[in-house]
Amino acid sequence: MDGIKYAVFTDKSIRLLGKNQYTSNVESGSTRTEIKHWVELFFGVKVIAMNSHRLPGKGRRMGPIMGHTMHYRRMIITLQPGYSIPPLRKKRT
């Protein structure tokens, strides 16, 4: 199960990078232990703490029909000092 969807780059997440904390959206059904194991295995880092919160989906209207987007979970992963996750490169066009 590939738990991490994508990295999040907001004002708060960029500020947390200075504290060696990385923010990403993950699948809503994944657990903390699964994400921790996956991050440690894939990136070769040591995770010391994980914070998560569930963000609600937003309402979307299309004519008379009211729908909604899916909810998702956001994880803030704190690494041990000396470890870092390499920056994600954006594809240039």
Swiss-Prot record:
One of its GO terms (biological process) is translation. Gene3D superfamilies: 3.30.70.330. It comes from the Eukaryota. PANTHER family: 60S RIBOSOMAL PROTEIN L23A. GO terms for molecular function: mRNA binding; rRNA binding; structural constituent of ribosome. Part of the 50S ribosomal subunit. Belongs to the universal ribosomal protein uL23 family. It holds the Pfam family Ribosomal_L23. Binds to 23S rRNA. GO terms for cellular component: chloroplast; ribonucleoprotein complex; ribosome. InterPro entries: Nucleotide-bd_a/b_plait_sf (IPR012677), Ribosomal_uL23-like (IPR013025), Ribosomal_uL23/eL15/eS24_sf (IPR012678), Ribosomal_uL23_CS (IPR001014). Its main location: plastid. It comes from Cucumis sativus (Cucumber). It is found in: Plastid, Chloroplast. Keywords: Chloroplast, Plastid, Ribonucleoprotein, Ribosomal protein, RNA-binding, rRNA-binding. This is Large ribosomal subunit protein uL23cz/uL23cy.
